[in-house]
């Protein structure tokens, strides 16, 4: 269904552009990759215009799968991301970033040594 299509597009197209954008040393090329990836972000933003999740009016598997990649993309140049008129997507991102589960998962721990 729609959920698997989104996840496949994320994994097979968006993730490729994210990596090219994030690790690109050539500024002009990075901007090109960012623009190419932006169409996927706009689609996600549109999906969130009248519901809480990407596929339903609640957070589902697809949201959890796609969130880490949107987070990575946003933090390459967060100021740029905030100025992209992706308000629904940014609100969705903030809900994840502020969730207790995310805070627990991202806690820093001492390095385990045995």
Model-derived segments and spans:
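GST-like domain detector, emphasizing the conserved glutathione-binding G-site
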Residues: 1-39, 49-52
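Structural signal for well-ordered, non-membrane alpha-helices
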Residues: 15, 41-45, 97
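Catalytic cores of transferase enzymes with a strong primary signal for eukaryotic protein kinases
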Residues: 18, 70, 102
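Alpha-helical packing segments of well-folded alpha/beta enzyme cores
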Residues: 33-40, 44, 69, 92
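Surface-exposed helix-capping loop/turn segments at secondary-structure junctions
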Residues: 46-57, 100-106
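GST superfamily/GST-like fold recognition
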Residues: 54-79, 85, 90, 96
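Long, charge-rich low-complexity segments
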Residues: 108-114
């Amino acid at each position: 269904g729609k959920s698997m299509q989104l996840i496949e597009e994320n994994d097979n197209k968006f993730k490729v552009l994210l990596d090219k954008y994030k690790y690109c040393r050539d500024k002009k090329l990075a901007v090109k990759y960012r623009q190419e990836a932006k169409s996927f972000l706009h689609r996600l933003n549109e999906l969130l215009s009248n519901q809480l999740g990407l596929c339903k009016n609640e957070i589902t598997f697809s949201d959890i799968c796609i969130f880490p990649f949107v987070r990575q993309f946003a933090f390459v140049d967060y100021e740029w991301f905030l100025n992209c008129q992706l308000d629904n997507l940014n609100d969705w991102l903030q809900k994840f970033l502020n969730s207790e589960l995310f805070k627990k998962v991202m806690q820093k721990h001492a390095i385990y040594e045995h």
